[in-house]
């Protein structure tokens, strides 16, 4: 997700109170959020900007909190010495023709008045994605898949795909997700929850790399991610009505094991490269809450420890002979630790005013060791970081009469370089290689914002303004490796780049939103967001304008009209993105201008219809049409076009 112009490692992802960001979260585009099963999601909460000291490093753009469903206790009215048990759950089947999407889901809740077990399983299959057929006359071939590579008789062959250019060959994948939660509540003031989550995918092709060409031929025959694995086990204890100053204690202890891998082979080459990464992460969070008559105080401690393993080799697919290649990250013992103390205070003042203040002490240590330095001719054998920062926030809110709310505040954010920033060796495109830089420093942001909203029984309207100063920003720029500006990497002479603290930047923007009850059953809702960002100390060569900050999306919004009856609901809505002109792209960053048109990414607008019908209390049927006009469009910075017209049917049976 992109939040206020920041994404990837600059946005903090949380699931059930557990930090997902790990030591190898990269600054580019991430797919880690797909490892949280949306079939069992209860809600998503977004905190914009570094406005809460409850969250630490990485929350520059904000925090995305994902909450999965909780086990539900069964409170029986029957008086008996034996606790009554109850079983309920859901069966879901979903099909979408746009990429032959098939999803099967089941969740079961077994409970009495003290114990509850929730089990969820989802199997997902996605075929090759079909893009829209309706294109602009200015770009009649944009996104068309004219070819793909196949292996026939041990030879790479370019296959003609001109008969089905809208089918983005080799873009499908499969995924399974398992969740198990156990809740024990011996009394109303104590709750124990054991949380197990397992997510695993098939190989996932890097579609954009498979479309690259050089001198009229494909660059790659194979480029895919191996199975993306996220295993988590967590224990959460909540105790309330405590004696003493603090009334509530929340403790969360968790362990995660994560795996990523990348496999690639150039066209007509027999050498296939394998790179494997594994992260083991242990976390602890303890929070105490005091709730007074006119104030509230949270204090807490947090700690996360990451251990990273990175291996690599090349295998000749003809002879099956292995050879050494550079690992993606440091190949020796590598670890990263985060420690924090925080306090957040809320004071309820006279006249409907509320004052929020907070402080957080952050400490981050990183130790990386490079064992095999010969391949890349490393000028060092280790890289170490020890960073400490104090961040804070202050804000005022006014909760007035008739639903008026006004709030304004200032906050600071901090992100320490991680293993991905510090030790990575990779190429985002042919002839371009990023090398490690051990001299990195933390990034800092300073944020101000103003929020105004008005809510009544018939309408709501709101607006938010924000402005962020970005200091010590990490950017990828030209670099010298052993005093050379280009090196041989994967058999290609490549220009050398590295992550560096070279930039100061500003990010600013606004959001407006509103909804109105046109009738008791009909709601009109709309939202619009605009973001702008640029470096303040860098300019493109030969230009007087400021260099654009990467990751900044074009303006976007949504307008929808929804009508709800007792058993039936329907919504028609439009989603739109503005132009992202090529002069607004950062050509050295992560904006991926090579996958846009020569003018940039065109504006687009699609229309969708959602309907739902509930014939009985236990059965719900839904039907959707996405991208009704079958428009061909692509999200900014993406290397794959979005779905064309897509018919989706879903059946949910509750028992």
Language model: regions and residue ranges:
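Flexible loop and strand-edge segments within Gram-negative outer membrane beta-barrel domains
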Residues: 169-175, 185, 189-246, 257-279, ...
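Gram-negative outer-membrane beta-barrel transporters
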Residues: 350-351, 355, 363-364, 467-469, ...
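N-terminal periplasmic accessory domains that precede
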Residues: 2, 13-14, 30-34, 46, ...
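Signature of Gram-negative outer-membrane beta-barrel scaffolds
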Residues: 297-401, 427, 497, 539-544
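Surface-exposed extracellular loop regions of Gram-negative outer-membrane beta-barrel proteins
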Residues: 202, 257-261, 314-321, 365-376, ...
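Outer membrane beta-barrel strand-and-loop segments of large Gram-negative receptors
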Residues: 277, 281-287, 338-340, 435-441, ...
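Transmembrane beta-barrel wall of Gram-negative outer-membrane proteins
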Residues: 99-125, 135-203, 229-231, 348-349, ...
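Short acidic/polar hinge/loop motifs at secondary-structure boundaries
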Residues: 20-50, 54
């Amino acid at each position: 997700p992109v939040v206020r112009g920041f994404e990837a490692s600059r946005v903090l992802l949380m699931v059930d109170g557990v930090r997902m960001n790990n030591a190898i979260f990269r600054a580019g585009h991430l797919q880690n959020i797909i490892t949280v099963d949306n079939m069992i999601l209860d809600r998503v909460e977004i905190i914009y900007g570094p406005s809460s000291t409850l969250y630490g490093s990485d929350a520059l753009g904000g925090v995305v909190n994902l909450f999965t469903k909780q086990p539900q206790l069964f409170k029986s009215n029957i008086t008996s010495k034996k606790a009554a048990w109850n079983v309920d759950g859901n069966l879901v089947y979903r099909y979408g023709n746009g990429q032959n999407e098939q999803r099967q889901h089941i969740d079961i809740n077994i409970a009495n008045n003290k114990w509850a077990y929730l089990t969820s399983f989802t199997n997902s299959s996605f075929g090759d994605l079909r893009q829209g057929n309706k294109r602009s006359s200015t770009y009649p071939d944009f996104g068309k898949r004219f070819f793909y590579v196949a292996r026939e008789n041990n030879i790479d062959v370019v296959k003609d795909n001109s008969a089905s250019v809208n089918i983005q060959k080799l873009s499908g994948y499969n995924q399974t997700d398992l969740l198990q939660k156990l809740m024990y509540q011996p009394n109303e003031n104590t709750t124990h929850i054991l949380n197990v989550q397992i997510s695993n995918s098939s190989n996932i092709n890097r579609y954009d790399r498979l479309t690259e060409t050089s001198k009229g031929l494909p660059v790659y025959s194979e480029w895919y991610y191996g199975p993306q694995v996220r295993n988590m086990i967590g224990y959460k204890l909540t105790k309330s009505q405590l004696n003493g100053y603090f009334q509530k204690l929340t403790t969360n202890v968790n362990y995660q094991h994560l795996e990523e891998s990348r496999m690639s082979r150039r066209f007509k080459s027999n050498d296939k490269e394998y790179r494997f990464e594994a992260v083991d992460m242990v976390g602890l969070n303890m929070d105490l809450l005091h709730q007074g008559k006119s104030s509230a105080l949270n204090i807490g401690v947090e700690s996360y420890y990451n251990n990273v393993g990175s291996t690599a080799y090349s295998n000749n697919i003809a002879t099956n002979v292995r050879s050494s290649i550079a690992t993606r990250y440091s190949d020796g013992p590598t670890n990263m630790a985060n420690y924090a103390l925080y306090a957040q205070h809320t004071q309820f003042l006279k006249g409907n005013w509320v004052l929020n203040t907070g402080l957080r002490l952050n400490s981050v240590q990183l130790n990386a060791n490079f064992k095999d330095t010969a391949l890349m001719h490393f000028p060092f054998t280790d890289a170490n970081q020890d960073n400490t920062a104090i961040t804070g926030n202050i804000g005022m809110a006014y909760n007035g009469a008739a639903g008026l709310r006004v709030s304004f505040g200032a906050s600071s954010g901090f992100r320490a370089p991680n293993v991905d920033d510090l030790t990575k060796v990779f190429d985002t495109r042919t002839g371009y290689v990023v090398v490690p830089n051990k001299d990195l420093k933390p990034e800092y942001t300073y944020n101000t914002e103003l929020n105004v909203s008005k809510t009544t029984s018939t309408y709501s309207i709101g607006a938010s303004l924000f402005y962020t100063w970005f200091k010590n920003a990490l950017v990828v720029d030209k670099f010298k490796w052993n005093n050379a500006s280009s090196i041989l990497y994967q058999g290609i002479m490549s220009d050398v780049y590295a992550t560096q603290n070279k930039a100061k930047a500003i990010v600013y923007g606004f959001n407006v939103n509103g909804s109105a009850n046109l009738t008791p059953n009909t709601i009109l809702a709309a939202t619009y967001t605009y973001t702008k960002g640029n470096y303040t100390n860098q300019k493109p060569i030969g230009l007087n304008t400021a260099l654009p900050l990467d990751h900044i999306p074009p303006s976007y919004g949504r307008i929808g009209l929804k009508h709800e009856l007792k058993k039936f609901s329907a919504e028609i809505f439009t989603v739109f993105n503005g132009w992202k002109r090529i002069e607004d792209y950062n050509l050295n960053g992560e904006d991926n201008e090579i996958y846009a048109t020569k003018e940039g990414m065109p504006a687009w607008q699609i229309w969708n219809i959602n309907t739902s019908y509930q014939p009985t209390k236990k059965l719900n049927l839904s039907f959707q049409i996405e991208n009704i006009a079958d428009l061909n469009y692509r999200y900014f910075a993406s290397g794959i076009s979005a779905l064309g017209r897509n018919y989706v049917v879903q059946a949910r049976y509750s028992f």
